[in-house]
Structure formats: C-alpha cells, structure tokens
Design a protein with these regions (language model features):
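N-terminal regions that are enriched for targeting/export leaders
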Residues: 139-141
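Domain-scale recognition of functional cores that engage charged ligands
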Residues: 108-133, 144-417
Length: 679
C-alpha cells in the first residue's frame, strides 16, 4: 500500500494524471486516503471522520468543491497550503513582517480644495481622465449596515434616489464628455469586482437599470472566488460547520482584483487601447469624484507609478497610514501600514512615543482611503511578472498559549493597496492628501457602531454622515464658486449630531469638477439658497440669478441647454424627519431620516427637447404665490383660466435648429416625475 501511494503520488506530481488534491479520493484504493491523511496533514479532510462528526470524508460534492478550490488559486491547493504554512509558522513564532524597516513620512502632495494649485492639478486630471480605466472593488453586502442587499444599491443621496452604482456610472459618463485630443475613441471602461455574495445582485442591478447609461461593452463584471479555510497552525483544511462534507471557505481579500485583471486579459486590453492610468476605488464613498481628478493630475505631473488618495488621520486611529519604509541596505518602499502595525513599529524604531500627532493635530502619516491611481505601464509590467499575485498575510485568533489551535478558522488574505511591494524598486510611489470634507465619507458602519464612534470623537462613517457630508461638501463648493447659502443647523439622526446644510445635489452631468461648478455659475451670478432648501441640478444648466427658499429641481436632457436668467422660488419644500423605529424602509433605518415631500411643495423644471432654453421673468397671476414661484413681482398680473390656475407658469425662450421664438407654457409640459426625466 505504501509503495502504491508513492507511485501514485509520483505520477500525480509529475503531471501525468494530476487533477489536484480532490482527485486523490478517486485514484487511491479504499483506505489509502486515511494513510495519506495520517502523514500529510493538509489532506486531513480525506481521513474518516471522528465518531462525533456528522459528516464523512468529503462526499462527491465536497470533492468537486476541492477541485474548484484547486483551480481557482494560482498554483492550486498545494501552493495555497504551502504559503499558509510559511505564514502560520511566522505568526506562531511572533515574527514581525516589518522587522528591520524604519518608517518615515513619505513624499506626497497636500492640496486645498479650490485654490490655484488644486485647480491646476484638477485641470490636468480632466485631460488625463479619458485615458483611464476604472476598477470598482465591490464585494460587500449591506447586512452589517442593516441593509438587505449589496452596498452599491444604497442611495448615495435620498433626495434623488441615485444609488452609489448609478452615481459612479454617471461620473464615468461625464468624464468621457471631456474632449481630449488623442484620447481612446471608445468609452471609458468600468470593471466591477464582485463576490459570491454580490455577483448576481450586481448584474441584476445593472441589467434592470440598462447599465445606467453606460454601454454593456464598457462594463466588465469579474467575480472573485473564495479560498479554503484553515483549522490550525499546520494548515489543515477546515470543514464547513454548516455542512461537514464541505470545506469551509471565506473571501481572500480585495487584493484578488489584480489577479483577475491579469487572468481576464482586461489590463492588457486597456493598455493596447491607449489607457495610461488604472483607477481603483471602493463602493460607498459619495465624495470620490470631488478629489479623484486632482489626484490623477498629480500622478501625471509628478510621474507617480502609484498615487494613493489620502486624508488627514488622527494618531492611533483605526485606519491604515501611508509610510515610507527604509530597509537596512538603504532601499525603501512607500506603502500602506495597518494601524495596529504602525504604532509598535514607530516605537521600536524612530519614535519612542509611537504614532502621535504633530503641530497640525493629526498624525504625520496620511490616512489611506483605498482609492488608488496606478500608471498603466508600470502596472502591466508588474502583472506580467507576478501574474497579479501580491503579498498575502494571515491573521489567526489563537485558542490558547500554545498557538496551535484557533478560536475559529482562518485563511490567507491579500489587500489591493499592497501592490507597491510588487512594483519595480525604481517606481515612484506617493500620495495626494485632501481635507476629509471634500474627499472621504464612506458608509461603513451600522447605526449602533456609528454611535459608538461618534461618542469617542471619531467620524461615524455611516449612512447618516455619508449623505449629510455630501450636502455639506456641495454647499461649501458652491460657496467657493460664489453662491450665498445660509449656514447649517444642528440636527440629530440615529443618535449622531450633524451640521445639516441645505440639501444641494448635482449630477456629474451638471459638473464633475470644481472648474465645472464655476462654469455653471455665470459671471457675477446671484445665487441665494436658504438652509431649509433642496436644490437638484441635472444636466447642462447655467445659473445667472436664483433665489431659493424651498425645493427646486431642474433637469436638462442631453442636448438641452438651460439658462436660469432670473428665478425666485419659495414653497413649503421638503423636510428631513427623524426615522421612526417602526419604519420598514431599511435605507431610512441606516440613514436615520426620511424625506417628507408634501403635495405641491416642489417646483420642478424638466427640459426634454434639445436646444437652448432660457427661463426669464413672466407675467404674474393671482394664484401664482401659492405655488411658490415668482419671477418679477413688479410685472402686472393677468387672469388665468380655472385649468391654468393649478399650474405655475414661466416663460421659456427656445432656440432650436428647426425654429426659434418665444413660447409661454405651463410647467406641466416641462416637468416629469423625478427621477424619470433623466432616464
């Protein structure tokens, strides 16, 4: 029997009949599996079960699963287990993977939103954007947040209902509208990495929404596979507690995105199309586009092979820090260091006090928000050399001091931001840091978890702040562009106190950059907005004079250009009501508020015909005030019919290729239920 085992294993190893470890159950005679398991712990799942076990040796389904696990990992299960043993041994001995490295503050750019330097980098980023490909790492469900679905389906803002996925797709569409000489002729590609948990829902959301305006050909959905779990420090494969005939599996980490881009051939395809940059971002940050373009501009100007979007980070905050790590031979690498490694590393080397604040009140090591810009040429060279496989780590929770058994199974993991470890030594790696208000407000925590973070003085990073921070950023940007907006008021939602600004939201089709916002406000524009107001702008709309105290929605379909010459809107408007515990809507639960939209409390202007449209003063009528719409109170009033009385009026001058002139039309002809008009 032993001779037979040796011969069969030799044949397997030589590739003559190798089908991976799952095939062993078929090629070994009965009883041999137990012999093999006794001398080779990694095949312990083939051994007969202990009496207390509910399952037997891997059933047919389990063996098929093992075969699948073998083919889905580069090098197969043999390589996976070999890597696991090395890392588990180092973990058991307490070895530090950063041993011998000395941390220091890396090279990067610190930008202030809206100033001249920021605008210069953003302008360069706009010119580089059509040469980019985008990769959205979206493997997460919203269950931990209290949302029953994929996180990409959560509304980035409740006032419009745009999901995060729609918001990102519309942003990519807007970037393609920047006409740059020499840019690839095709659409800007979007790659979405999903998981077993999110793949079907993500594809369904794209299908039912007609890809949010993107073409099917430009969207690529790649599913990440799971890896086998390990039961102890000998890297024995763990049985699934829910089905002991199966191997337990867990996600490998978002670092798999690099291998998927390599094996799918997409990275090479993008390079052949003339793409210079590949941009990685994550699934629930509504402020991503506010900072991304300037980061791309910094990469182009500074020649960064990799550039991380960063934010100021509180000392010892549970957020990875970007650091320059110098080796004993003088060479160095700039990369993310996890917060639980950074402080002890500093104490052991250059800073006895560890990770402490500097004169700014923040740690000198910028916070990593996992938005990355990589130069395609360097990235492709790295993929070709590594096949997209990046450094792995293991994080077991030991059951006792022997450090042999685990409290629960573990697995190997890898992180997307670890790619600098694989870049060539000469590659220039840096960061671009922005204030948090304009760049980073992810939806990461449940309402209960967010309250705890709020109580300790940390940012809640919840559904509540994800939306209210977007309002605040938009109001601040409009003020920088010349608008006058009332200051915020204190409100509390889900136990979190926020500074609630006017609910100002615009689509990327209105503006995707600060320069775009400034261009949408005419020179010497007079825009005044009260704090209780809601303003939604979608499309090619120029504001010259607008006074808003209430709710106003303006939509311009593609090909339509709207100029607001003068418009005064005062109506009941929309209100944010604190959520009721009994509210069945999960989005209301995670955000902590619902939006009350009383009948007749909204002024909607929707322009669906192509051409130039100008909204200017029109004659008044006695019933106009109740609709909250005025244009020029000094103009004479005129009587309206009973049918007209229910509709606000305005004057619109349309200048189209086929005709011109002025027409006066009821609002109903231009207004449609939002958001249907933009579809």
């Amino acid at each position: 029997r032993w001779l037979e085992a040796v011969l069969r294993l030799s044949a397997l190893a030589s590739g003559l009949c190798f089908q991976g470890p799952p095939a062993l159950g078929r090629v070994l005679r009965p009883g041999m599996a137990g012999c093999l398991a006794s001398v080779c712990p990694c095949f312990s799942f083939l051994a007969p079960p202990r009496p207390e076990s509910k399952g037997g040796a891997l059933a047919a389904g389990g063996k098929e699963q093992a075969k699948w696990l073998d083919t889905s990992y580069s090098g197969g299960l043999e390589a996976y287990i070999g890597n696991a043993r090395k890392l588990l041994k180092a973990s058991k001995l307490g070895e530090n993977p950063l041993e011998g490295l000395t941390p220091s503050v890396p090279t990067g750019e610190r930008l202030n939103y809206g100033d001249a330097q920021f605008q210069a980098f953003e302008d360069r980023g706009l010119r580089e954007a059509p040469f980019s490909a985008f990769v959205l790492v979206a493997g997460g469900l919203g269950e931990r947040l209290g949302f029953p679905g994929i996180k990409l389906k959560i509304a980035a803002t409740s006032v419009t209902g745009w999901s995060f996925l729609e918001y990102y797709c519309r942003g990519i569409l807007a970037l393609k509208q920047q006409h740059v000489e020499g840019a690839p002729s095709g659409p800007i590609p979007l790659v979405i990495m999903t998981s077993d948990d999110t793949h079907e829902q993500t594809v369904a959301l794209l299908e039912e929404s007609d890809f949010f305006g993107l073409s099917r050909e430009q969207v690529h959905v790649l599913k990440q596979e799971k890896v086998a779990c390990l039961s102890d420090s000998d890297a024995r494969l763990a049985r699934d507690p829910k089905d002991t005939a199966q191997i337990e599996t867990k996600p490998h980490g978002h670092g798999d995105v690099h291998a998927l881009l390599h094996t799918s051939g997409l990275a090479r395809r993008f390079q052949s199309e003339g793409r210079r940059w590949i941009v990685f971002f994550q699934d629930t940050n509504g402020l991503f586009f506010r900072a991304f373009l300037a980061t791309l501009g910094v990469s182009a100007v500074k020649g960064f092979a990799m550039n991380s979007v960063a934010v100021p980070r509180k000392a010892k905050d549970a957020m990875g820090g970007i650091a320059k790590l110098t080796r004993p031979d003088g060479s160095s690498i700039t990369m993310n260091v996890e917060y639980n490694q950074l402080d002890p590393l500093l104490r052991a080397t250059s800073c006895p006090d560890g990770d402490v604040a500097d004169h700014t009140g923040f740690s000198p090591f910028p916070g990593n928000m996992n938005s990355l810009v990589l130069r395609m040429s360097d990235y492709m060279a790295t993929l070709e050399r590594t096949r997209g496989i990046i450094a792995e780590f293991v994080n077991p929770k030991y059951a006792d001091s022997s450090r042999n058994k685990f409290k629960s199974s573990t697995r190997l993991e890898c992180m997307m931001q670890e790619i600098p470890q694989e870049l060539p030594p000469e590659a220039k790696v840096g960061f671009t840091m922005f204030d948090t208000w304009c760049s980073y407000s992810p939806v990461k925590n449940s309402p209960a978890g967010a309250v705890e973070k709020f109580k300790t003085g940390n940012h809640p990073q919840s559904g509540t702040t994800g939306e209210t921070d977007l309002f605040a950023a938009n109001c601040r940007i409009l003020r920088l562009a010349g608008a006058t907006i009332d200051p915020p008021v204190k409100r509390t939602f889900n136990g979190i106190e926020v500074d609630l600004e006017a609910r100002v939201v615009w689509s990327p089709q209105w503006a995707v950059s600060f320069a775009g916002v400034r261009a949408r406000l005419a020179q010497d524009a007079k825009v005044q907005i009260t704090q209780r107001s809601t303003l939604i702008l979608d499309g090619d709309i120029i504001l010259e004079e607008l006074t808003l105290d209430g709710t106003l929605i303006i939509c311009a379909a593609p090909g339509s250009r709207v100029t607001i010459k003068r418009l005064v809107v005062k109506n009941e408007g929309w209100e944010l009501d604190p959520a009721s515990k009994d509210d069945p809507d999960p989005e209301v639960h995670i955000k902590g508020f619902s939006i009350r939209r009383p009948a007749g409390a909204t002024c909607q202007l929707a322009f669906e015909e192509p051409g130039e449209h100008v909204v200017s003063p029109a004659p008044q009528w006695p019933g106009m005030a109740k609709h909250g719409v005025t244009f020029n109170e000094k103009e004479p009033q005129r009587e309206r019919s009973e049918a007209e009385e229910s509709l606000p009026f305005y004057r619109v001058r349309s200048m189209k290729s086929s005709f011109g002139g002025e027409t006066e039309a009821p609002l109903e002809e231009f207004a449609r239920d939002f958001p249907a008009s933009r579809r």
